[in-house]
Amino acid sequence: MTTVVDAEVQLTVVSDAAGRMRVQATGFQFDAGRAVAIEDTVGKVAGVQAVHAYPRTASIVIWYSRAICDTAAILSAIIDAETVPAAAVPAYASRSASNRKAGVVQKIIDWSTRTLSGVRRDVAAQPSGETSDACCDGEDNEDREPEQLWQVAKLRRAAFSGVLLTASLVAAWAYPLWPVVLGLKALALAVGASTFVPSSLKRLAEGRVGVGTLMTIAALGAVALGELGEAATLAFLFSISEGLEEYATARTRRGLRALLSLVPDQATVLREGTETIVASTELHVGDQMIVKPGERLATDGIIRAGRTALDVSAITGESVPVEVGPGDEVFAGSINGLGVLQVGVTATAANNSLARIVHIVEAEQVRKGASQRLADCIARPLVPSIMIAAALIAGTGSVLGNPLVWIERALVVLVAAAPCALAIAVPVTVVASIGAASRLGVLIKGGAALETLGTIRAVALDKTGTLTANRPVVIDVATTNGATREEVLAVAAALEARSEHPLAVAVLAATQATTAASDVQAVPGAGLIGRLDGRVVRLGRPGWLDAAELADHVACMQQAGATAVLVERDQQLLGAIAVRDELRPEAAEVVAGLRTGGYQVTMLTGDNHATAAALAAQAGIEQVHAELRPEDKAHLVAQLRARQPTAMVGDGVNDAPALAAADLGIAMGAMGTDVAIETADVALMGQDLRHLPQALDHARRSRQIMVQNVGLSLSIITVLMPLALFGILGLAAVVLVHEFTEVIVIANGVRAGRIKPLAGPPKTPDRTIPG
């Protein structure tokens, strides 16, 4: 669908499936400010769940509910945003990659801090009508990340509170001086409560209540009932859980923070013939950056001079250094090998590949998975419901029985039903899991993508660029009618001289001939026709040109997995050229691993059936669909999806419709490819296909941990409430069980951050074409 606003402005819906739309804008003055205006305007449309504008590629991605709004309403809002005056653009910072002021990983770190402390500031995170925080009421984390337990202020206070509480017990037993005992208990209560009461009161003043509010009420109630020791014990135990949560959160984020070291603070640039050291933030597009052996690249660029082997393991997760030379694109954070490089800067430090990747992840965090939505749906109304239930228990019990007994039980029920462990059950797992995956070159865009990835049962693999490396080479030339190998290649190269098609590149690389044909015309779906030395020459697929006496040889080429093209001059066949895009060396291993894991594997390709079948056999794939156009792939993926959760793996460009049609789109080799990263839900940054089963297994394990955490949290609440109501457990016992549960949930969630790197480079199988 295309909407023309005027002669210059045009909106094109690139993909629209599963409540996710991607719109390409042309003719816009698409800068950072306009991105803010688009996000603000489109975000106000009823039914729009999240929106993100990308100035770099002039595209907008929208998640919306089809039942509430349609494509026309969204496009209309984008058009309206294009006319918003600059002075009327909202004052908040754009979430677009071209206007980032935080560090490369800082925004995702900030997000995880907000998520795990219950403070959400991004759009769609907190509807305006909410009055309840899902998570514990915690203060903002300290600027300096604690690396040891004793560095956490809340744990230091908890320890001091515990010492005072222990001293009160010793004093009561050895020296029954009650003023001293009460003083120690009161001091223990004050120190422990200082970790959560101030923030709870602050949030209460803002009209929000959370678990900290429940604990504050319970502590005050215990004091009112004369149970100072119970109140002090509650404050001590809850302060421990608060401190442990902060420590676990910091520990989880430290893995992400380590990525900051990938980008050096300084870079050497060549200005006016002199090498000058400047801050990385001062680099400009067009600068000539000098990178010496052992140094990291400060930003993205293109090599102008020099050759080396780059270590990109920290970015792509691949351990084998990549050989690069003049004209090759290089990325921020890569480590230079032995050579000295002169690199032309193509992106600023704030807009390099690492910054864009982290930014996109941060922007997509508003998309919660099913487990997080379930936890939120339970936790948000649970807190005020608990307060109402506790008030009813206290009131009814006071009328029918002993008021002191029932008020105390109401306070215990208040604490027993607190959903603190439930609220952190999923976020801590998501942050740990996504952070671990990103360190190995797997970009997972938010909790929703992580959970969906964990439910996938079928995988559709595109052939070109996914199963193969998209680097075809000429592997055989058959001749006839007296033509030579060089003559056949020369005619083919003449027709392909001005083409950038991968097959053309392969043919041109196989010959030294440089003469280009004239009057070259493309015949869609067939081949090329032109004139060379006054004679008519043609190049095309079998069927358009008659293979004649080379039919058997052409069949042999196709059975070997090669694409065969025929060459003809003056209606006389000269020969056949076999061009093969080799399977990735790890393809068969990956397919075998997927099938062992219970995944249904299907190959999709636009190539002919014979070639597709041959390559599929080499890879071990049984289900093959060939001669597909992009829209055919999308339709086929939709059919697979109707049967079971399906992931589509492609390059993210030609496969955009299929990626959008799947439950989950996975882009292969997405490093430096904006469209691939924007289109897919998961991006494999490197070229090693073994990251695919690694990501699937990691997500499946992470989802299991989420389910375990949510199940345990709900079970504990379900068990504790009746025990508290009937007086079987007291306040201290309930708090102890709750905080022990929270420790288990945190520790279990952190396990999602464990992922093993790939073991060495893939083995290269020996493949030859039959003679």
From Swiss-Prot:
Compartment annotation: Cell membrane
Transmembrane annotation, as ranges: 72-92, 163-183, 209-229, 330-350, 387-407, 411-431, 657-677, 716-736
Domain of life: Bacteria
One GO MF term attached to the UniProt entry: ATPase-coupled monoatomic cation transmembrane transporter activity
Residues reported to bind Mg(2+): D651, D655
Record GO biological process: metal ion transport; response to copper ion; transmembrane transport
Record keywords: ATP-binding, Cell membrane, Magnesium, Membrane, Metal-binding, Nucleotide-binding, Translocase, Transmembrane, Transmembrane helix
Lipid biosynthesis among keywords: no
Protein name: Probable cation-transporting ATPase G
Record organism: Mycobacterium tuberculosis (strain ATCC 25618 / H37Rv)
